[in-house]
Structure formats: C-alpha cells, structure tokens
Design a protein with these regions (language model features):
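Solvent-exposed loop segments that connect transmembrane elements
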Residues: 2-14, 51-79, 125-145, 221-241, ...
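Face-selective signature of the C-terminal outer-membrane beta-barrel domain
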Residues: 5-182, 307-317, 321-330
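Hydrophobic, lipid-facing positions within transmembrane beta-strands of outer-membrane proteins
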Residues: 20-26, 85-91, 153-159, 187-191, ...
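Short loop/turn motifs that connect adjacent beta-strands in outer-membrane beta-barrel proteins
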Residues: 31-36, 96-106, 167, 197-204, ...
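Transmembrane beta-barrel strands of outer-membrane/channel proteins
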Residues: 39-45, 109-115, 172-176, 193, ...
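Gram-negative outer-membrane beta-barrel transporters
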Residues: 164-169, 271-281, 287-410
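Surface-exposed extracellular loop regions of Gram-negative outer-membrane beta-barrel proteins
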Residues: 198-248, 273-295, 461, 466-473
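C-terminal beta-signal and adjacent terminal beta-strands/loops
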Residues: 390-391, 399-418, 433-437, 443-494
C-alpha cells in the first residue's frame, strides 16, 4: 500500500491506498491432423482500496485550522474498496498451410469469452459539505454505507488468413466484439503486409493497419453504483447521464524495416501512429434552477500517439563455453497528446471546490488537461545468458529514461505557489529527473523434467531500488517510481 499525506491547504486529509492481484491459467494444445487447437481457461483477481483517516470531508471558506488563512479542505471520505474477478475461456484453431495455385494460405479462427464479476463497497457512512462565511453548512451530501455488484459478459470472434505469393505476404483479418453493458456491436478490420525484398530475410518491409476496441467500462459502472448511495441533505439533486455511449477504440498504423548487417547483426526500425477515438470522459455542471448537479459521460476524449523504435540484436547468440549470450539494444521514443481532463479521480465529493490553479491560472477542474505521459527517449540494453546443460536462463534489462514531465501539487513553500490563490489547490507541470533501472530474471527448466515442461522463474524489478523523484525539492509532495519488486512464477505445460 501507499499513503498520501496532507498538504498546507488540505490538513487532516491523510489516506492509504493499496491493491493486489493474482490468478491462474491453464493452456492446452491439441495437434489435429489438419490444424492445431489451443484452448486457454483462466481466472484472475484484481482489487484496490482507499482508506481515509476521517469520514467527513468538508471545505471551510474561512479556515479555522491552525494559521491557515482563507479556504481549506479537511478530512476524508472513509473506506472505499472495489474488486473484479475475470473468468476467461479462449480457443484458437490454426490451420495447416495449404496451396491454391501459386498462392499459399494459412488461416486461423478464434473465439473468446470473458465474464467480469465486480463489486464495490463503501464500508462506512461518510459525508461532505461546505461551511460558508456565515458558518452554515451548504452542499451537504451523505454517502451511505453499501455494497453493490456488476457482471459484464464479453464475447469475441476473429479470423485471419496469411496469404503468401513469392516473397510477399498479406494477412487480412476481422474481429467482432460485444459486451452486454454498453451493448455495442463492434467490428474491427485487421491488415498486415510483409515484403521480403531479396527473398532471403536479409531486408524486409512490413506495414499494417489495425483497429482495437476497448475501454475502462467496468470502472464507470462501479462509479455509478456508488453514486446511487449518495443523498443530498441540502436539497441538491444528482443526475448521471450516459447518452448511449460508444465503445472507445484505437486506430493503429504501423511500418517497419528489418535489415541484416554483416553476417550476424539484425537491425529493426519501427514506427506506430495510434489515434484513440471516442474515449470516455466526463463533465459536471449544476443547474441552478433545479438545484441538480449533472454528471455527463460522453465520448469526447481523443489521443494521438507517435512511437518510434530502433533495435540491434544478433541473429545467432555468442557461444562461450557452454553459455549462449544474447545481447540487444533498443532505442525508443513516445510522444502522446490528448484532451482528457484531470477529473478522473477515484471518487468525487460535493464540496463545491471545483476550481484549481493550473500552471499559474485559475481554471475549472474539468478543463485541466491530462498529465503529459510522454517518454522522450528510452534506451534499453538486454543481455540474456543461457546455460543449455542445466536449463538455466539469466535475463537482464538495463534501462535509461530521459528526463520527462510530471504533474505535482504545490505547497506554500514552493516558489511557484501563488498566495493570491491560497484558497485553491494548485497544480504545476514539473520535470522528472532521468533514471537508470535494472531488472533481472532467473528461470530454470530442469532437464530431468524436460517432458513435463516445468519452469521456475524469479524476477527482481528495479534491482538497484532506484528512486526517481520530482526534481523540485520544496514542493511538499514527492513522486517516486516503483521501488524494488519481487515476483515468483511456476509454470508447467502438458
């Protein structure tokens, strides 16, 4: 779990947040006379919680806490949790290659079913309000204790065919998706082409266009359940509108080059342009005539992302004694821009505090753009060591990340803090320092159990426990990347 501590204008507002996940999966491959059938059955569990130290969240227009002047917001909204269990069944049939004339075909067909069983719980009653200058409560809202659940069925069918003629391959395909929450029937085109210029795999060009549907529909449904436990004591009503939401999707255009350099070096360059459409966003407004706070979900969100990747690796590993060494170096750059707002938090409260200071300007909370998650430049060095006699593999990744921007909350001691706006929460876009991390993985496939395909793996992420913080020391809030993390994995194929 992690913990957020209060800031100068949000006293007594500490909270703890935590999450966990685990799951099981079973894969079965069946070789038929004319095709290969793969079946997967799985289950995974994901849960998270937010536990505030207090059950009352209120804003004072004239703060009575300590020596704070002007507005301050105090307290919390109690204990809220949510979880989802996903039950998965997947099957895919890969046909053996066959030839019609001078053209070969290798089609495949697949189907998937995922049932998501989710619940959310408010463990205790909490409330929020505003104390105006006269000392009276306004915008008083009670969040009742409750527990609710939501089940969503997701169905998928897909098919594609790899068509090859001489040194050119095409792969047209199509995918159908449906879920019973938004009840949208979505059809996605898929296409990929590959040209082996000299028909010897030394120089290759690839290009493709794909559409992918999906979005965080489940979280929106759980939010709606929690909103149903909300009661306005002040007489204000709440209303949520969905307006026949569409399913968010991404259009992706990709191009790639592969060139063999000398006898044993392969260079690859890839570019991907991804455009997100119909992303779900929300906005809130108050109808003064009916005293109704209206939250509208819509498909106004959109994002454009450019990804570049350049890599060098060996076609055949280096052999030293009984150890195979596979080095690889990867340069990547990602630039993304979108219009989704900051207002996508875990939970809302009706304190009337709907304006913030963003980069020195007083603006509506809904109008603040999403934080810039660009990764300007990343360089990764991968080095794998394989000892064939024992079945041991030691994989390592050393990654350098260029300095990038992040969004922080300003404290009063920060030079960028504007005292004129001391009544409001203040955000600023700052720079994160460059970082260097090392991830390692040790896996063992016992040779005496080779037929059982047993593999035991241990991962250590961020071995050096590197801490990457906001490079402004007097913000009052420090943001760090994940610390050292351990994983243990045991798998068996039969």
């Amino acid at each position: 779990p992690s913990r957020d501590y209060n800031t100068s204008t949000f006293p007594e507002s500490d909270r703890e947040m935590g999450n966990k996940s685990y799951g099981l999966a079973w894969d079965m491959d069946t070789q038929l006379a004319w095709a290969k059938l793969r079946t997967t059955v799985g289950w995974d569990h994901i849960s998270d919680y937010t536990r505030h130290d207090h059950d009352i969240w209120y804003t004072e227009l004239s703060c009575t806490y300590g020596d704070i002047s002007g507005r301050c917001t105090r307290g919390g909204l109690g204990h809220i949790s949510q979880a989802v269990d996903n039950y998965t069944f997947k099957t895919r049939l890969d046909w053996q290659k066959f030839t019609v004339g001078n053209v070969s075909h290798q089609p495949y067909f697949g189907a998937e079913y995922i049932y998501s069983d989710a619940w959310t719980e408010r463990h205790n009653q909490s409330e929020s309000y505003v104390i105006n200058a006269a000392g009276k409560k306004t915008n008083h809202t009670i969040y009742h204790k409750g527990k609710g659940s939501l089940g969503i069925d997701n169905y998928t069918l897909y098919m594609a065919d790899r068509i090859s003629w001489r040194n050119v391959s095409l792969m047209p395909g199509v995918r159908y998706d449906y879920d019973n929450y938004l009840s949208n029937h979505n059809i996605s085109p898929r296409f990929m082409t590959e040209w082996d210029i000299f028909a010897d795999q030394t120089s290759m060009i690839t290009a493709g266009y794909n559409r992918y549907y999906g979005g965080n529909i489940l979280d929106m449904g759980l939010r709606d359940i929690r909103n149903s436990w909300t009661e306005s004591v002040s007489g204000n009503k709440t209303l949520t509108r969905y307006q026949d939401l569409k399913t968010p999707y991404n259009d992706e255009l990709a191009m790639g080059l592969q060139q063999k350099i000398g006898k044993n070096v392969i260079a690859r360059a890839n570019y991907v342009y991804r455009e997100a459409h119909d992303q779900i966003s929300k906005s809130s407004r108050t109808d003064s005539a009916t005293k109704t706070t209206i939250t509208e979900y819509n498909n106004d969100g959109k994002t454009k992302t450019h990804s570049f990747n350049l890599s060098f690796e060996l076609a055949e590993p280096l052999h030293i004694s009984q150890v195979d060494i596979n080095p690889q170096i990867v340069f990547s750059y990602i630039k993304s821009k979108g219009n989704l707002s900051l207002n996508n938090g875990y939970e809302e409260s009706n304190t009337g505090d709907n304006r913030v200071v963003y980069n020195g300007n007083l603006v509506s909370y809904d109008s603040v753009p999403v934080a810039d998650f660009n990764n300007p430049l990343k360089i990764s060095l991968n080095m794998d060591f394989t000892h064939q006699p024992s079945g041991l593999v030691w994989a390592n990744t050393l990654t350098w990340q260029e300095a990038r921007k992040a969004r922080i909350i300003l404290g009063k001691m920060n030079a960028q803090y504007i005292s004129e706006y001391s009544d409001y929460k203040q955000y600023v876009d700052e720079k994160l320092d460059s970082s260097l991390t090392w991830d390692t993985r040790l896996s063992w496939t016992p040779q005496f159990l080779k037929q059982q395909n047993l593999t035991i793996s241990a991962d250590i992420l961020n071995v050096l426990d590197s801490k990457t913080a906001v490079d402004t020391t007097n913000t009052g809030v420090a943001t760090y990347a994940s610390g050292r993390t351990f994983w243990l994995d045991v798998s068996m194929k039969f």
